[in-house]
């Protein structure tokens, strides 16, 4: 299975996250954010902090990189709430 994976440390809270985008189907991609330990191992693979499904590769990659960049500088709870509403 192909995908993108990034390790992110939030500057405001020092929390660590793993952002993952994988291909779930022919035209279905899923981006998930997992809370991570100090060594960037996901704390729970079955319960991601946020999950976003998209229908094109370009849209999935844009979502992945936008989440990665914003998660570095913004408060995670606000960011997750914003993305959950859209």
Regions from the PLM with identified roles:
Residues 25-29, 57-59, 73, 81:
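Intrinsic disorder/low-complexity signal
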């Amino acid at each position: 299975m192909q995908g993108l994976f990034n390790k992110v440390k939030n500057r405001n809270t020092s929390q660590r996250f793993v952002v993952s985008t994988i291909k779930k189907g022919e035209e279905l991609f899923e981006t998930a954010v997992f809370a991570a330990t100090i060594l960037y191992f996901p704390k729970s693979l079955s319960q991601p902090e946020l999950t976003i499904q998209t229908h094109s590769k370009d849209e999935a990659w844009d979502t992945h990189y936008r989440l990665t960049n914003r998660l570095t500088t913004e408060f995670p709870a606000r960011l997750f709430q914003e993305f959950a509403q859209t």
